[in-house]
Structures are given as C-alpha cells and as structure tokens.
Amino acid sequence: MVMHARKPQRMNDGYFEKHTSHTSYQSSKYSSSKRDYERDRSSNYRDRDLSPGAGGGGGGGSAGGGGGGSGNGGGPLNNGNSYRSQSPDIDSPSSRSHDLRDRSDHRGGGGGNGRGGSGERYSFMQKMRDRDRDVYKKDKYSDKRDRRGNDRDSESSYRTNHDRDRRGGGGSGGGSGKLCSSRENDKRSGSDDRDRDRDRDLRDLRDKRDRGSDRDRDMYKKDKYADKRERSDRGERTARYGDWSEHVSSSGKMYYYNCKTEISQWEKPKEWVDRERNLPRDQHREKDYRDKDRDRDRDDRFSRSTYKHSNSSRDNSRLRWNYDNDGGPPSHRRRLDGRHNDNADMDISGDSTPTSEASYSLSGTPTTHGGGPGGGGPGGGGGSNSDQPMGNALPRLSSHPTANSSASVATGTGATGGLHYGSGTGGGPVTGATMLPTMSGMLNSNSSNSAGGSSSNASSSSLRNSVVGHIGSTSGTTVPTLGSQDPHQHHLNSNAPLPPGAKGKDQALLMRQKMHLGLGVLDVQSHHGVNSVGSVSDGTNHAYNSVNNSVSGSLRDNSVNSPLYMHHSMSPSLNFTKSPIPTIVGHTNNMSIAYTCNPPFGLKATLDGGVMVANASPATPGGNASSGSSGANSSQSIVPGMGPVCGISVITSMGSNSGTLCEGPPTPTQELDLSGSALEQQQLAAAAAAATASSLQLQAAQQAQQQRKLDGTSSATLSSLQSCVSSSGQAANLRGPEISPKLAKYFRADLIAHVTNWHAEVLERQAQKCCEDTHLFGDITCTRICAELKCARSLVRSTEINATLQEQKIMYLRHQIRRIEESKTQNAFMSDDT
C-alpha cells in the first residue's frame, strides 16, 4: 500500500499581515464554508469509520446500501470517473461529500463476497480525506490554481489505477488479516479525527482573534486617516468675516489678516467681536419673530372662533354693538378700516376670561344701562335725567349720523378721594356726523358746579382727568383719561356690568369721541373753576398729595372691575381698530415724573397731533368746596367738557410707571393698537413732548434744589448740556426702556401696579437723569481733554523738531566760525610774513 506524505497545514504564513485591508473579506468568504465543509465530512466519515467493525464479520455486509447477495451490483458504476469530478461546477463541498458517500456504497457492494477488503478501503479513504483537505486549502489562493489542476489530474489518475488494482486483487485473499488491520486502522483514524477536531477548533479561535485584531487595526487606520483629512479640511477652510480672515501662525497662535489693508494682528477685530456677540441675539430675535408670528396666527384663529361663539349667545337683555350697521365684528372692522398693522389683536370673549357670565359681560359687546335720576344740591339746580337710549349715546361712524341727543353731563361729589365737586346738568346737542360736542351745556354745568358742592348726592360720579402718556412708542404724549373713584361709576367697555342708576356715561362718551376724532383744538374758554383745598403753596406737595388722593380713593373702591376705557387710538375715524376690550395701562393715579406747575393753573388743552400742552396761567379761584375727609392738598381745575383735573403729570417711561389699580379680574391680554396714522401722530407728538418736558424739567430743577443737591455751577452745566443732546436723544431719555410695538401688547400695567407710583420713584428718576447728564458731561469733557492732549503732543513734537534744527544750525555756524577764524589767522600770518 502506497503511503503519501501528508502535507502540513499552513497555519499562519504572514499572508493576512501583508493583506490587512482584505482581511474581513477573505475571512468571511472562506471561514464559514470551510468550517461547515470540514464539520460535515468529519461527522460523516466518523460514522462510517465505526460501522465496519459491527457489520464486517457477518459475511462482509458493508455500511453502504448493498447487501451480501447483491455483491457485484455496484460493479459497473465503479469506474474511475465516479470518484472525482473534473467539472468546476460540481466541485463543491457538498458534491464531494456526496461523491464520497456514493463511493463508499459502491465499494461496499463490490466487496460483498466476504473476502474482507474493507480495512484497506477505509485506510485509503482516510488518505483521500487528507488529500482533499490539502486541495481545499490550496483553493484559497489564486496563485495555486494551476498547480491545483495538475494535482487533481494526478490524483484522479492515481486513484483510478490504484482502485482498479485493488479491486482486481481483492477477490482472492485472506479476509481475517485484512479485517484485523482494518480495526487497527479504525482506532488510529478515530484518534486522528479527535486530534484534527481539536486542531480545527484552535485554528478557528486563532483565525477569529486575528480577524478581530485586523479589524481593529483597520478601524484605527481609517479613523486616523479620516481625522487627518478632516484636520486638513479644517485647515483649508479659513474663517472669514468681511475683509478679515483667521489664520494659524507657526507657533499655533491665531492671528487675523486684513486682505484690503494687508495688516496682520493678534487681536480679534472689533467687527468680528461684535458679530460674535450679536449672533446669538440675532438668532434669538429670529426665534422670537417666529414665535410671535405663530402666536399671532393662533390669536387670529381664536378671535374668529370666539366671535362666532359670542354671536350665538346674543339673547340676553344687554344692548350690544350692532355689527350689521357698524361693519362686522372688531376684527373685520379693523381690516375694513385699512389700517391693519403688524400688531396682532386678540378679541377676548367672556368665555375665555376666568369669570362667569352672571357678573361680567362679554367684552366684545359693550354693555350699558340707562342712567337713573341724579339728585342735585341746594344751589345746583337738582335736575334729573331720563333714561337715554344707547343708540343715541354710543359713538358712531361719521358715515352713520344719528339724531341730536341731549348730552347728560353730571359731575358730582366723589365719596372717595376727598375731591368734592358740585353736580349739575346741562343739555347740548351732539351731532353724530361730526361728533363735535357743543360746549355751552358743559359751561353751564361748570358754572353750576361752583354754586354747591358738599351736599350733592353721593351716588353721582366724580370724574377726574389725569394727564397720562401713551404706552407705545410715544410716551411723551399726554392724553386725558377718565378715572372712576365712585362705586357707581362704570367705564364703557369694561367687564363689569353697569349697575342701574349710574351717571357720567355721556361725559365718558364725549371724552372718547374727542380722543378718537383728534380735534384740532379743544374749545376751552376762560371758564375755569378752581377749587382750592388746603395748602397749595408747595408744588411738590401738590403732586404728592394728588397721588395720595388717587391711591386712597382707588384702594377704597371695591367695585371698579376694569381699567379705563381705551384711549390708545387717536385716529380721526371712530372705527375700532381693535376689539372694544379696555386696553388701558393707566388709572386715575397715573403720576409719573411729576413736573408740577404752580398750584393756580389753567389747562390749555390742544390736541395738535394728539399732544396736550400744559401752560401755567392764572386761573380764577372760586367755588365753595368743603374740605375732604382725607385732607387732600390738591389743586383742581374744572375744564368744560373734561371734568375736574387734578395735577399735571408727564409720563416719561413707556408704561413702566403707569399702574392700573383695579380690583376685578383684568382681561388676559391688554394689547396696544398703534395704527398707521396714530403712529405718525405719536411720533410727531414725541418731539413736541420732549421739548415740553425739557422746559418742565428746568422748572422742576428750580423747585427741587434740595432733592438734586447740585450747586449752581453744575445746574448751569446740566442745563447747557441740554443743547448738546438732540431732540431724538431727549425723546429716548424720556421714553426710558424701549418696548417694540409687537411686545407692547403683552404689557400689563396692573401686574406692576404694586411697585409703581411710589414717592421714591420721582426722586429716583430725577437722580437717574442727573447721573446720565453727569456721565454725558464727563464724556464730553474727556473727549475735549483727549483732543487737547493730542494737540499738545503735536506741539511737543514740532517743538522738538524745531529745537533739533536749531541745534544743527548752531553747530553749523560754530563750525563756520571756526573755519573763518582759522582762515583769518592764516591770512594775518601771511600778511605778517610779507
């Protein structure tokens, strides 16, 4: 029997180390098929190797399918071609195993005569198995293919010849010796199989570990390469802003290069720093704009839905706006008005407010009731007014004129605040086409006010005009607003229902009409009734006490459930560009920086551009007003058509110092409508108010020297600095913190009412103004000094240059003198010689 030397397996010849990039591909390509192939073959052959020992002694029955009687049945198939296929299509692990199985079956059938050729047959199968494994190892590498083809040819020829010789000589031999040798070979092959399985497991583990290390090495190389490439890309991408670009020096430090001026510097340019500082703010502003747009869309949808809902609940007894005549709901009227701006509105219905319908009406539908009889005093000619239909009293569009109606003007003594006035009535026609009130009735009422005051009915309302500024971009604008100190006073467009017998609604309507129509000049004649109460000598005490009166009256009033009626629209049309919700930021105690005039004053109220200018003029003191319960020291001026006016205040910050003292629940949002025409008027008004406020500030500076604690020199300096500041700068200083129109609708003064209008705020603002002026003066002085220093440096340099030139001249002249003297001595010596 020919024994072929077994070729040792190639465990690790460095191929994977040389070809690390293809490790995963090769291992995945061959490892699984190789393991399955070897496992199947080892299991099949192990089963077949053990079978001849059991069946070989019983007449030569083999492990195959052929029995003893059909011993020669497989002979015709036992040619050499059935062992090894030369076609590459069938040369697969499965085809090889099938071929070997068939081979064993045929060979078992051929040896069925009991002559016992099985031992040699199985030892030969062991050799064949080793040879096939070697050939399979060779298949892994492409450079072995030609050699593999030659090996196959030689193997097939060897096998066919050897098997043919084996088969030919197998018929006549001793079976017992061959059977023993087959058993010995079976034992040896079983131990070899176990060793091979162990070697194969170790090899698989080693291959798996090598594959993992190769994969880690590949990943490390890939990450390092990617990192290097990214670093190079980052180096190629130089940061630029404007003309400046950022570079890295050889020492690794960043420097900045200007391509225009060709200047390099270590410091980051100023515009670069400003851009980095403003970048998050710009991003935040863009986000705010997106949020505002989303809120505006949601508010529009909400207003439409709430308007539909409020239309469905119109069956109560209160009178409402006739939207059919007025041009639709507030949002539609705003759009029809043609002055729709970016400021989003939100029509708050009664369903959206945290109140019940029983105590608060829908804000989209202003409510009112007829006024009851008003009792007059002994000298007041106590007349009574009958109930007045709301259709005649409500303000209408100029295109919808109404019939003339008697305007009931009732001013009486307020039960709170210590402000007592006489009550009187006067009738005057109010034409709906122009809404210009006739002043005669109100003059009569004012003349009757001086007749009787203390004994008038407490149920009539005391109206008070406080000069407050608009909260929008023109805080210098001073417009009159009506405040309520009486429980029976009801503001139009408030959330609280009007109790029966309330007075003063007509005068509130007239005031609103004046404000909305933007009259050129309010017809104020020389009929001023001044009720002086207590000491009126000190202007500062006058301002403080008027604040005290308002605050005390508002705190005792528990039925004022809303802020004032809307005063924000100074447009010539009466179209409500917003919903009729009271969007008010001030109450009767709006006393910001109190630039007080002397106590006897009149009010020349002009509405040129919506500005009320207060002039100090002698008023006619008169009237017999009784002393109030709170002991107020306030100066009051009864202006026809406007009610009694207490104090003059100019608001200089945009709503931060105007508070609304209201005990009822306010509306969820108090928005501001700055329409186009109103915005232009208020911008014009800001400049005029700035000039007025500057003059008033000078008066306040003269009256409050003990507060400013400044000597005459600094006061003169500060007053001279006013000329250095432009009117826009003054307006900016007057306005205080800037609030954009889009943010103004989120402002609610009632939320800060508890920290506003304190006495210390006046002093604080004056001190702040003084501090700002001082800083401005210091800046101007520093600028002047810096300029002088530069001039002085230039003079020093020019003087040094002149001195150097002078020294050069002196040296030159000395040198010339020396040469001349030498030449003179030489000439004298020569003359002596001659």
From Swiss-Prot:
Listed PROSITE patterns: WW_DOMAIN_1 (PS01159), WW_DOMAIN_2 (PS50020)
Domain WW, residue spans: 244-271
Tissues of expression: Expressed in adult head and thorax and in larval central nervous system and fat body.
Entry GO CC: lysosome; nucleus
GO molecular function: chromatin binding; RNA polymerase II complex binding
Ranges of Polar residues composition bias in the record: 304-314, 350-363, 472-496
Major localization class: nucleus
Short name of one Pfam family: WW
Biased composition (Low complexity): 22-31, 402-411, 431-466
Record GO biological process: autophagy; chromatin organization; habituation; negative regulation of autophagy; positive regulation of TORC1 signaling; regulation of autophagy
Disulfide bond annotation, renumbered to this chain: none
Domain of life, source organism: Eukaryota
Matching InterPro entries: WAC (IPR038867), WW_dom (IPR001202), WW_dom_sf (IPR036020)
Known role: Acts as a linker between gene transcription and histone H2B monoubiquitination at 'Lys-118'. Regulates the cell-cycle checkpoint activation in response to DNA damage. Positive regulator of amino acid starvation-induced autophagy. Also acts as a negative regulator of basal autophagy. Positively regulates mTor activity. Promotes, in an energy-dependent manner, the assembly of the TTT complex and the RUVBL complex composed of pont and rept into the TTT-RUVBL complex. This leads to dimerization of the mTORC1 complex and its subsequent activation.
PANTHER family xref list: WW DOMAIN-CONTAINING ADAPTER PROTEIN WITH COILED-COIL
Protein name (record): WW domain-containing adapter protein with coiled-coil homolog
Species the sequence originates in: Drosophila melanogaster (Fruit fly)
